[in-house]
Every structure is written in C-alpha cells, then in structure tokens.
C-alpha cells in the first residue's frame, strides 16, 4: 500500500492515506532481517535504529531526528532518494510511558511525541554527512511524508493486556453498568 501510494502521488485526485507498519514477534525471529530484505528488493535506502537508544532532543543519546539523518546517509545524501526510504525502529515496545511517575521521561513519552510528528509526515532539518548538529555542518530539509516507518518489538505482555481489556465491564454504551455513584450495592 505504501509504495503504491507514493507511485500514484501526483497522478490521481484521490490520495491514499499513509500507512506505516508494526511488526510483533519475539527477539530473534527475523524482524530486522525481513526489513533488510524488503529494502534490498525495493532498492530503497534503509536506516535501522534501536528505540532504547533514543532520547528527547538535547539529552545524551540519539534523538528521533538523528534516525532521519542515518537514512539520508544511507541514501548517499540524496534527499529525494531518502524521502522514499524505510526507517526501522526496533524494540519500540521498550519506550512505553511509565505509569505513575513524576520524573522527567526523556526516553519514553518524549520520544513517542517526537516520533508521532515524523510518522504523520513532517519536514525535518538534518545535517548532511554527519550525525550531530553543529554550526559547521550544512542542514537539508527532509520530508518524512513518503518515508515508510516500520516499528518492531516483542510486546511480551500484550496478550495479558488484551485479556484484561476484554474482561472489563463496559463503562459506556448499551452494556454500561448504570449505577449511581452513591449506590452502595
């Protein structure tokens, strides 16, 4: 669907919505290998990042925009080629928001917010030929609108989370339990 959308981008009046991918599977099952093979078959540049190494911009570690910089480097600094590449973010399940914490979460929710901007399609300024921003490195603008984002993770507790949600009583709709908050029954 993604590359059909890119190919028909200017030909049709109807725009096909961008669809990124989520791959779920245990560690070592071949998610990364599958993405590498896909990029090779499609002859598009590929950048692979580990979500656990991503942090909010300004902190030690890679920010989410540095992944776009890696993609640009994989495309030999050809912006147009990079804009049709693939970014694979592995271990995405590790950056889930922590419950009931009052501490600054520089590698969880902040990364999620930064990632949403890229996944939906935005323009990002990234350095040419380098992974760090400094005054001496020229910047180019990369539009993420046509970049295919594939995220992968093991999601070990997913089955239990689904069971919990399915077993909950409905709180709205026809099956809602309509008790008054002052009922003691």
Annotated model-derived regions:
Residues 1-47, 51-60, 64-185:
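AAA+ P-loop NTPase nucleotide-binding core of proteostasis motors
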């Amino acid at each position: 669907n993604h590359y059909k959308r890119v190919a028909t981008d200017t030909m049709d009046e109807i725009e096909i919505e961008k669809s990124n991918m989520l791959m779920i599977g245990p560690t070592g099952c071949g998610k990364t290998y599958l993405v590498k093979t896909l990029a090779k078959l499609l002859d598009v540049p590929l950048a692979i990042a580990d979500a656990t190494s991503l942090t909010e911009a300004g902190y030690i570690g890679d920010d989410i925009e540095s992944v776009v910089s890696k993609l640009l480097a994989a495309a030999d600094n050809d912006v147009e080629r990079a804009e049709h590449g693939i970014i694979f973010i592995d271990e995405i399940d590790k950056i889930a928001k922590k419950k009931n914490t009052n501490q600054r979460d520089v590698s969880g929710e902040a990364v999620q917010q930064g990632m949403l901007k890229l996944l939906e399609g935005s323009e990002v300024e990234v350095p040419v030929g380098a992974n760090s921003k400094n005054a001496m490195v020229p910047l180019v603008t990369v539009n993420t609108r046509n970049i295919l984002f594939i995220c992968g993770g093991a999601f070990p507790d997913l089955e239990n989370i689904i069971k919990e949600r399915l077993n909950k009583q409905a709180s709205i709709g026809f099956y809602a339990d309509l008790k008054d908050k002052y009922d003691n029954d």
